[in-house]
Amino acid sequence: GLPHRFGEHPGNGRGADCLIMAWAILDSVGVYHPPFDERWLELARAAKWEELQALWDAATEPVPRMEEFSVCLFENGANGLGVGIVVENGVLVVHHKRGVCWLPPRAMRESEYRRFVQ
């Protein structure tokens, strides 16, 4: 898949940022999410993971189990936190080394799946 590139929209073909990719997928299928907030990228760039986690927790609510187009946060190596989105019964992520890849549910079994609150 596309390489990891901070702040890139996957539609441009140069790379993908996990947060922007999740928003793009949710847009394409008509699933609710809040408007994109550049502050999330600024916090990630500054490695302010606790603040980013707090925004995530405030904007989302847990779902009882993994469901199509639910989202999750995960540890992403040197890049701190990453966002994954459930697509076709697996999780699409942007790995800091491997780029965009689809993972089977067992690879993300420790994740808490959430959806954006309206």
Regions found by a protein language model. Give the residues of each.
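N-terminal capping segments
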Residues: G1-D57, E68, E75-G77, L81
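Short, surface-exposed secondary-structure edge patches
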Residues: T60-M66
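Aromatic- and glycine-rich peptidoglycan recognition patches
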Residues: N76-Q118
